[in-house]
């Protein structure tokens, strides 16, 4: 407290209630190919319904990406998804048909297109890049001729003809209102041609117009705020409307679209999916690199090629050290005549025999039903294995193994591309590949819990790696409270008193068998203190999952006491 110069009472508070916070370990991450949705921007997806809403239904080009995500979401409910696009060949559909535009996401639109008339795109662009945007049509009614309004194809979607809003009327203006309709012209979004997707009644041409609750009613802002399908890029019929449209309301009589006998209707075109290559997918995965910006724990790779899988392992997991990457072999490896050898060769050659406790590899692909296209598809299992980890976190804790009959049951399996027999399982497992198997009466199971770490270590098991991720994330967050404090006995004691109760809880929940926290003058020497450093050493003995069971059945003669033979066989 400050020194007092005269008598008085000063009240102060000291907060010593710091605890180790909960650390998320169930958040999935994926980057891949989709028909729709923001590109190179992570979106949170909570369910398959939300996945369809944001990234649309799968087709033949996007099915593996879609179902990798959908499969994870059958086990967990927190997924970050990034869409990959090709900067050269992927294009955004425009009202003008100009095929040179790629507006990747909301951030790019707001920075480059929101505030200025572009001219070359026409009045509207699809909200997201891809050929799906070519299915969109926009119709605008912006005049007060009742007879002509009654003949407008979309008249019945509105209560009345547009006129003058109360806001503009109060400002001495007139004729600012307009109606906008967004139509699925080709039926690619809704399944039915001509379906009206969105309507925007009585929006304003005045840039400062407000609605009844004080939000902007300027039609550009309303479309930006509410539409799932389009962005504004210019005023319709710019030659005749630019003088008044987009100006303030005071004293303005806003221009009609000149041809009062018709609405201003335009179909978007020139959208293209492009050819997505490995580098594009890696660019999408790069959005997960910074642990300070985005928190993820379970990174799936779908059917990504080996270069992309290695990028995810080396540039994301090994860099962040707070997440695990899940990979599968190529479909060709598990449908060959020698699948065990081919999967191991993929592990050793294509994946460069990478050694990392932050990576997990499974043995194959599954056959599952695609309800959106009424067909069956082969899908890699890494989305399911990551999902099993998420489900394990929810039902128990991250330090439990996700494998086996209790927690390793794989969902939505018609059949496996490869059923590894015992000899094959031995070959796969000693090379760090976790077999996925089917047993009669038990279903399809993840039957291994190894990481891709090559050397013998506690960290060559998934549960131990994820235990340490959980401990490190939680305790490091608690340690931030010690930043800029003094490195003295009080601060060290406070740190120990924060960490030890947390570790006792983990021990009680079977994550560790014992622990010790050292944070005193023995490791915070005067030299450490003078370097403005603070050291806490945390020793733990992790619990180990059972991988091998031996059952000994011993026949004993009648009249022989069991005490005589127990321990001697």
Identify the residue ranges that each predicted region occupies:
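Structured, hydrophobic secondary-structure cores that serve as assembly/anchoring elements
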Residues: 1-104, 108-116, 122-127, 171-175, ...
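Charged, amphipathic alpha-helical segments
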Residues: 12-13, 97-107, 132-169, 519-521
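Beta-strand-rich solenoidal segments
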Residues: 140-224, 228
